[in-house]
Design a protein with these regions (language model features):
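A generic structural signal for ordered secondary structure
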Residues: 3, 16, 41-44
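Short aromatic-glycine-(Arg/Gly/Cys) micro-motifs in beta-strand/loop hairpins
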Residues: 1-13
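A short, exposed loop/beta-hairpin motif centered on an aromatic-Gly-Thr core
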Residues: 12-20
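Short amphipathic alpha-helices within nucleic acid-binding modules
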Residues: 25
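Short, mixed-charge low-complexity intrinsically disordered segments
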Residues: 30-58
Length: 58
C-alpha cells in the first residue's frame, strides 16, 4: 500500500490516502467529497513513515 500525503487547499488540512495507485487514490478522494482540483499531493510514504506523522487516513 502507498500512503499519499495530501493537502486540502481550502482548509489547509493534511491527510493521507492509503491505496494501491493514483486511480484508486482519486476514487477515494471523490468518494469522500473532495474536489480533485483543490487537493495537492505532497508526498508518497511507506506505512512506517505515515504512522509516525499520524494524520487522518482515508
Amino acid at each position: 500500500m502507498l500512503n499519499y500525503l495530501c493537502q486540502d487547499n481550502e482548509s489547509g488540512e493534511l491527510f493521507f490516502v492509503q491505496c494501491a495507485d493514483e486511480t484508486e487514490r482519486d476514487e477515494i478522494l471523490l468518494a469522500n467529497g473532495f474536489d480533485l482540483d483543490e487537493i495537492d499531493i505532497i508526498d508518497v510514504m511507506d506505512d512506517e513513515d505515515a504512522e509516525i506523522l499520524g494524520y487522518d487516513t482515508y
